[in-house]
UniProtKB/Swiss-Prot annotation:
Encoding gene (name): apeB
EC number: 3.4.11.-
SUPFAM superfamilies: Aminopeptidase/glucanase lid domain (SSF101821), Zn-dependent exopeptidases (SSF53187)
The species this protein was found in: Streptomyces coelicolor (strain ATCC BAA-471 / A3(2) / M145)
GO BP terms: proteolysis
InterPro entries in alphabetical order: M18_aminopeptidase_2, Peptidase_M18, Peptidase_M18_dom2
Protein name: Probable M18 family aminopeptidase 2
Enzyme class: hydrolase
Keyword DNA damage included in the entry's annotation: no
Gene Ontology cellular component list: cytoplasm
């Protein structure tokens, strides 16, 4: 898996392992939690009373995780330094009545999640993974990581104009994957199949949150293998970098003036409005309870929040060699050119001048370059959890990330060096 580079590729090798182990947000937070556990962090339950103890802690809620490290002697009003990211990616998700079919084909009824590049999901070997809710109230993760499903494209002989007029897909009729032959009801019991896969008794599963994923593993690409192709880089690349950075800072034993935090949310791709999304109460609740657990008052909470800074880390757009005119003519982020700072004067990104200075200082300390992304004026600008975090919590927030190609494809493309550079910048930010 290793590739030659002027930089250490160990981080990128580990990213590829993380991507493969994290086909869903639920698996992603489990993977992050396992890495933090190895670094000495421990899980705390939201239903328990929290103690005023130092060290690393984390909260899991669905497909979200908030982790933080309290240094020895931290005051109740000690500010936070937060790395924010999201765990979800566009895909196809299984409907409540999953079994369907037609003309002798067994199919799975799916709904489109987020804004995927749907052509990238056609004729691709897909697995199925997610969370099963059981009759006893517990949950179980499941991952069928082998070719199970496929959305077959119509042959060109039956769609003669596809190459000249473009691919046209009806979201309801054309995207239901096949997974075998037979009667859709008698032979197509998907949940029974998953119960067998998970080693559960029939009828034990009473609810599910299931989604498709490409089973093709991440891989180095190019003559010098300076590129990485893989799924869910938007935005597990940032989740992985943030997890590694937080673990590194906690292990350093340094005298920290801030409490470093990782907040990885679900549902960014659909607006963040959920109890596990950035527009929900999770982050604010964790930060407040951390202040109060250390004997703080509401005044201490206000002081801590006033001094807090968040880096909202999400992937951005590298200049595309075939579509360079879609970019701002004076801002062309390049692959392996270092992390990007995202700016939009209409507050689609949260970055302002003071935020730029914070990120520039972190990159200077880490001795790495950074680039700036601004949208072409003639095209709408996307957004992130950054403006939501700034507005909801009154926290100074800066939008950053790594430039990639093919964002929202089933298989995206990044530079092999950029993930490592991002992680180094995050370490320097969390440990100024």
């Amino acid at each position: 898996m290793s590739a030659p580079s002027r930089f250490d590729r160990g981080h990128t090798d580990d990213l590829m392992t993380f991507l493969s182990a994290s086909p869903t947000p639920y698996h992603a937070v489990a993977s992050a939690a396992a890495r933090l556990e190895k670094a000495g962090f421990r899980q705390v339950a939201e239903t328990d009373a929290w103690e005023a103890t130092s060290g690393g802690k984390y909260v899991l809620r669905g497909g979200a995780i908030v982790a933080w490290y309290v240094p020895e002697g931290a005051a109740a009003h000690t500010p936070f330094r937060i790395v924010g990211a999201h765990t979800d990616s566009p895909n196809l998700r299984v409907k409540p009545r999953p079994d369907t079919g037609a003309h002798g084909w067994r199919q799975v009824a799916v709904e489109i999640y987020g804004g995927p590049l749907m052509n990238s999901w056609l004729d691709r070997d897909l697995g199925l993974a997610g969370r099963l809710s059981l009759r006893d109230g517990s949950t179980r993760l499941v991952d069928v990581d082998r070719p199970l499903l496929r959305v077959p494209q119509l042959a060109i002989h039956m769609d003669r104009n596809v190459s000249t007029e473009g691919l046209k897909l009806d979201k309801q009729r054309h995207l239901q994957p096949v997974w075998g032959l037979g009667d859709s009801v008698r032979d197509g019991d998907l949940i029974a199949f998953l119960e067998d896969e998970a080693g559960l008794a029939r009828g034990e599963v009473t609810g599910w949150d299931l989604m498709t994923h490409s089973v093709e593993p991440p891989a180095y690409l190019g003559r010098d293998r300076e590129l990485v192709a893989g799924p869910r880089m938007d935005n597990l690349l940032s989740v992985h970098a943030g997890t590694a950075a937080l673990a590194s800072v906690a292990a350093s034993g340094a005298d920290l003036p801030y409490i470093p935090v990782l907040a990885a949310f679900d549902h960014e791709e659909t607006g963040s409005q959920s109890d596990t999304g950035a527009d929900g109460p999770l982050l604010g609740g964790v930060l407040e309870r951390s202040v109060f657990a250390r004997g703080g008052s509401y005044e201490d909470r206000a002081r801590a929040f006033a001094g807090t800074v968040c880096l909202s880390s999400d992937t951005g757009h590298a200049v595309h060699p075939n579509y360079a005119e879609r970019h701002d003519p004076t801002h062309h982020p390049r692959i392996n050119g270092g992390p990007i700072l995202k700016v939009n004067v209409n507050n689609r990104y949260a970055t302002d001048g003071s935020g730029r200075a914070v990120f520039a200082a972190a990159c200077e300390k880490a001795d790495i370059p950074f680039q700036t992304f601004v949208s072409n004026n003639s095209m709408p600008c996307g957004t992130t959890i950054g403006p939501i975090t700034a507005a909801r919590h009154g926290i100074s927030t800066v939008d950053i990330g790594v430039a990639i190609l093919s964002m929202h494809s089933a298989r995206e493309l990044c530079g092999a060096d950029d993930p490592h550079l991002l992680a180094n910048a995050l370490v320097a930010f969390l440990q100024p």
